[in-house]
UniProtKB/Swiss-Prot annotation:
The enzyme's E.C. designation: 4.2.1.9
Biological classification of the source: Bacteria, Pseudomonadati, Pseudomonadota, Gammaproteobacteria, Alteromonadales
Keyword Manganese found: no
GO biological process per UniProt: isoleucine biosynthetic process; L-valine biosynthetic process
Species the sequence originates in: Shewanella sp. (strain MR-7)
Name assigned to this protein: Dihydroxy-acid dehydratase
Cofactor requirement: [2Fe-2S] cluster; Mg(2+)
Catalytic activities: (2R)-2,3-dihydroxy-3-methylbutanoate = 3-methyl-2-oxobutanoate + H2O; (2R,3R)-2,3-dihydroxy-3-methylpentanoate = (S)-3-methyl-2-oxopentanoate + H2O
Modified residues (N6-carboxylysine): K124
NCBIfam families, sorted: ilvD (TIGR00110), PRK12448.1 (NF009103)
Function noted in UniProt: Functions in the biosynthesis of branched-chain amino acids. Catalyzes the dehydration of (2R,3R)-2,3-dihydroxy-3-methylpentanoate (2,3-dihydroxy-3-methylvalerate) into 2-oxo-3-methylpentanoate (2-oxo-3-methylvalerate) and of (2R)-2,3-dihydroxy-3-methylbutanoate (2,3-dihydroxyisovalerate) into 2-oxo-3-methylbutanoate (2-oxoisovalerate), the penultimate precursor to L-isoleucine and L-valine, respectively.
Length: 619
C-alpha cells in the first residue's frame, strides 16, 4: 500500500521538530497518522468571483475532519481579468497561471500533504490549480465559487439581461446616452461569482466536471444559491473517500492522472465545443494535458471541432441565455448526456462523483435531467436567481418553476436540433498560422464564416484601440494585432477592448481581428487568436504589411496571407537583417518588469498551451 506522504514529516524521532510545529497549528496526539488534506483557496477581495470564498475553506475542512482527515488551508493569488483589462495589468494575467500552479505545488510538496481540494473560480485560477493537481498526482477534488447571476435592467421599457461586456460596449457607443450607459454598468454584475456568461471562468469550471475532477453542478450552480453549500461539503467528503481508496486500498483510479486521461480530455474538449466555450480553454487544456503527460494536441482539437455539434449557445454569443439558464437545463451533465446520446462521449472513464468502481456512465444516470429518476437532482437543477445584489454566498434559495428540458428550442439542444452540426470552436491553419490559430465560431455571424479583407497592422493592443476609436479602421479591414503573444507581450493579453470597440462603432460584422494574443471569454465576432508561431517566435504574422489581403474560410479551416512565397521570403530576410531587433516591435513603448521578462524567457507559443519550454529546463 502507498504510504501517506505526510508520514515524512510526522513519523520518527528526527521529525520531533516538525511534529512540534504541527501541534502549534492545532494537531493533537491522536491526529498523527491521519491523512493531511491541503485546501488551496483563492479568496481575495479584489475579484467578484472570489470575494465570497473566505469561509469556504472552513466548510470543506469541517467535512474532511468529520471523515477522519486533517485539513490545512492556504491561499493562492487571483487576478481579475476584467479589472486588469485595458492597461498594463493584463500583461500579468496569463503569467499568474504559472505562479498559481507553482504555489500550489510548493505548498503541497513542502508540507507533504496527502491530498488536495482546490477552491477556485476565475479565469487563470482554475487552470493554474488544475496544472498543479495533475503535476502532483495526489487525490484531488475541485469546487468553484460558482457563477454570478445575470444582470437585468429595463431599457426603453424592455427587460434585458446583461453582463460585463454589455457595459463595455455601451460605454464606448456614442449613441448610448450617459444615463443608459450608467444604468447598464450598475446592473451588469449584480452578485458575487464569476461573470454570468460562458466566459473563461465558467467554461473552465464546466470542463473540470467533464474531466472528472469536480462534482455535478460545479460549473453552473449560482454562487448565491444555498444549494451550492452542499458542493463544498461533498468536496470534503469525496476527497477523503478518494484518499482512503488510494492509500488504504492501493486504488490508483483515485488519482487525477488516471481520472483525467486522454479520453477525459476528449470529453472535456467535446463539452467545450458543444457549449461554445471560451477560446482560452484551448490554451488551458493544452497546458493541463502537458502536466498530465497526456498527448492531447491541437490536432485532436481540430479533429473534434469537425465532429462535435454546437448544442448550447450562451452569452456572449446570445443575450438570451446565461449560466443560470444552463443550470436550469441540466448544466454540464445535461450537455454531456446529449453528447452521449450522439455517440460522442467516453462514459467508461472514472469520475470523482462516482463511487469506487463507478464511472461517468453511472454519474450521468443520476445527474442527467433527461434520464434521472431522482427528484432531488431535478430540484437541484431548478435552483435559480433571486435578482438581489449581494456579495454573500448561499444567500438565497429561489427555484425555477420547472426544468428546461426542451431539447428542440431550449438552452441545451439535442444533436438533431443543434445550433450547428459543427461545434463552437475551430482550429484554422495556413501560411499565416503554420501551427494553427483558434476562432470561437459560436460567436461568429453566419455572414462572416468566410471573409477577405485588407490588413490594418498594429504592434500593440493600445495602438489598435487608438486606431479603432480614431477612425483608422474601416469596413473590410482585417485588424492585425501582433507582438502580443506569450513571449512577445509578454503575457498574451486579452483583446476584449478592441473587439468591443469594433462593435460599438458598428464594425462588429464588417471587420475581422487576428492576433497572436488571446481573447476574453466575453469576446464574440470574427475574432481569431492564438496565432502560432507568434510574432516574437518568428511567426508569419510578424511579416504582414498594411494592405496585404487576408483570406479567412472557417468552413475550410483556412487562414491565408495572400502574398507570394518569394515575397514572404524577402520580408523574412529583411526582418533577420535587423539583428538583435528582429522579431521585436519597433514602435511600441512598453515597460516590462523583471518578473514578466523571466516569464517570457521560458514561454512557448499558444499551440503548446503557452507553458514553459521544458527543453530549456531539462539537463
Amino acid at each position: 500500500m502507498p504510504k501517506l506522504r505526510s508520514a515524512t514529516s510526522t513519523e520518527g524521532r528526527n521529525m520531533a521538530g516538525a511534529r512540534a510545529l504541527w501541534r502549534a497549528t492545532g494537531v493533537k496526539d491522536n491526529d498523527f497518522g491521519k491523512p493531511i488534506i491541503a485546501i488551496a483557496n483563492s479568496f481575495t477581495q479584489f475579484v467578484p468571483g472570489h470575494v465570497h470564498l473566505k469561509d469556504m475553506g472552513s466548510l470543506v475542512a469541517g467535512a474532511i475532519e468529520e471523515a477522519g482527515g486533517i485539513a490545512k488551508e492556504f491561499n493562492t493569488i487571483a487576478v481579475d481579468d476584467g479589472i486588469a483589462m485595458g492597461h498594463g495589468g493584463m500583461l500579468y494575467s496569463l503569467p499568474s497561471r504559472e505562479l498559481i500552479a507553482d504555489s500550489v505545488e510548493y505548498m503541497v510538496n513542502a508540507h507533504c500533504a496527502d491530498a488536495l481540494v482546490c477552491i477556485s473560480n476565475c479565469d487563470k485560477i482554475t487552470p493554474g490549480m488544475l496544472m498543479a493537481a495533475l503535476r502532483l498526482n495526489i487525490p484531488v477534488v475541485f469546487v468553484s465559487g460558482g457563477p454570478m447571476e445575470a444582470g437585468k435592467t429595463k431599457l426603453s421599457d424592455k427587460l434585458i439581461k446583461l453582463d460585463l461586456v454589455d457595459a463595455m460596449v455601451a460605454a464606448a457607443d456614442s449613441s448610448v446616452s450617459d444615463e443608459d450607459s450608467a444604468k447598464i454598468e450598475r446592473s451588469a454584475c449584480p452578485t458575487c461569482g464569476s461573470c454570468s456568461g460562458m466566459f473563461t471562468a465558467n467554461s473552465m469550471n464546466c470542463l473540470t466536471e467533464a474531466l472528472g475532477l469536480s462534482l455535478p453542478g460545479n460549473g453552473s450552480m449560482l454562487a448565491t444559491h444555498s444549494d451550492r453549500r452542499e458542493l463544498f461539503l461533498e468536496a470534503g467528503r469525496r476527497v477523503m473517500a478518494l484518499t482512503k481508496r488510494y492509500y488504504e486500498q492501493d486504488d490508483v483510479s483515485a488519482l487525477p492522472r488516471n481520472i483525467a486521461s486522454f479520453k477525459a480530455f476528449e470529453n472535456a474538449m467535446a463539452l467545450d465545443i458543444a457549449m461554445g466555450g471560451s477560446s482560452n480553454t484551448v490554451l488551458h487544456l493544452l497546458a493541463a494535458a502537458q502536466e498530465a503527460d497526456v498527448a492531447f494536441t491541437m490536432d485532436d482539437i481540430d479533429r473534434m471541432s469537425r465532429q462535435v455539434p454546437h448544442l448550447c449557445k450562451v452569452a456572449p454569443s446570445t443575450a438570451k441565455y446565461h449560466m443560470e439558464d444552463v443550470h436550469r437545463a441540466g448544466g454540464v451533465m445535461g450537455i454531456l448526456g446529449e453528447l452521449d446520446r450522439a455517440g460522442l462521449l467516453h462514459t467508461d472513464v472514472p469520475h470523482v462523483a462516482a463511487d469506487a468502481g463507478g464511472n461517468l456512465k453511472s454519474v450521468l444516470a443520476k445527474y442527467d435531467v433527461m434520464q434521472t429518476q431522482d427528484d432531488k437532482v431535478k430540484q437541484f437543477f431548478m435552483a435559480g436567481p433571486a435578482g438581489i445584489p449581494t456579495t454573500k454566498a448561499f444567500s438565497q434559495d429561489c427555484r425555477w418553476p420547472s426544468l428546461d428540458d426542451d431539447r428542440r428550442e431550449g438552452c441545451i439542444r439535442s444533436r438533431e436540433f443543434a445550433f450547428s452540426q459543427e461545434g463552437g470552436l475551430a482550429v484554422l491553419s495556413g501560411n499565416l498560422a503554420d501551427n494553427g490559430c483558434i476562432v470561437k465560431t459560436a460567436g461568429v455571424d453566419e455572414s462572416n464564416l468566410t471573409f477577405t479583407g485588407s490588413a490594418r497592422v498594429y504592434e500593440s493592443q493600445d495602438d489598435a484601440v487608438a486606431g479603432i476609436l480614431g477612425g483608422e479602421v474601416v469596413a473590410g479591414d482585417v485588424v492585425v494585432i501582433r507582438y502580443e503573444g506569450p513571449k512577445g507581450g509578454p503575457g498574451m493579453q486579452e483583446m476584449l477592448y478592441p473587439t468591443s470597440y469594433l462593435k460599438s462603432r458598428g464594425l462588429g460584422k464588417a471587420c475581422a481581428l487576428i492576433t497572436d494574443g488571446r481573447f476574453s471569454g466575453g469576446t464574440s465576432g470574427l475574432s481569431i487568436g492564438h496565432v502560432s508561431p507568434e510574432a516574437a517566435a518568428g511567426g508569419t504574422i510578424a511579416l504582414i504589411e498594411n494592405g496585404d489581403r487576408i483570406e479567412i474560410d472557417i468552413p475550410k479551416r483556412s487562414i491565408k496571407l495572400a502574398v507570394s512565397d518569394a515575397e514572404l521570403a524577402a520580408r523574412r530576410e529583411t526582418m533577420l537583417a535587423r539583428g538583435p531587433m528582429a522579431w521585436k516591435p519597433l514602435s511600441r513603448q512598453r515597460y516590462v518588469s523583471m518578473a514578466l521578462k523571466a516569464y517570457a524567457m521560458l514561454a512557448t507559443s499558444a499551440d503548446k498551451g503557452a507553458v514553459r519550454d521544458r527543453s530549456k529546463l531539462e539537463d
